[in-house]
Amino acid sequence: MINTVALFWALFIVCVVNMLRYYSSLRALLVVLRGCDPLLYQYVDGGGFFTSHGQPGKQLRLVRYIYERRYCDHHDGEFIRRCERLRRQFILTSALCGLVVVALIALMLWH
């Protein structure tokens, strides 16, 4: 029989690894964005994106830009591919985080 606590921790570790992959992909996207579209880079606060003084409103612009697939009309193919990858990773990470929360609640109820 599988230990439910061990299963929860395995799921949690997979979720954290996917969060790190998402973070890394977001950093790579900002590097590509700085080179191919400096105006959009400034619009989403690319320089201050991962700093403590970053502007959440501008950061949400990038999230909306990717979520609404506005990147499909962009002229740079690499940027489009990275946005697609980032969007898929965001969906996967969100689903895994939701699953971890559900598993934690179930674990608390059963133990």
Curated annotation (Swiss-Prot):
Family, as annotated: Belongs to the universal stress protein B family.
Top-level division of the source organism's lineage: Bacteria
Gene name in the database record: uspB
Residue ranges crossing the lipid bilayer per the database entry: 1-21, 90-110
Membrane topology according to the record: Multi-pass membrane protein
Family matches, as InterPro entries: Universal_stress_protein_B (IPR019598)
GO CC terms in record: plasma membrane
HAMAP family: UspB (MF_01088)
Protein name: Universal stress protein B
Keywords linked to the UniProt accession: Cell inner membrane, Cell membrane, Membrane, Transmembrane, Transmembrane helix
Organism listed in the record: Edwardsiella ictaluri (strain 93-146)
Intracellular or extracellular location(s): Cell inner membrane
Primary localization: membrane
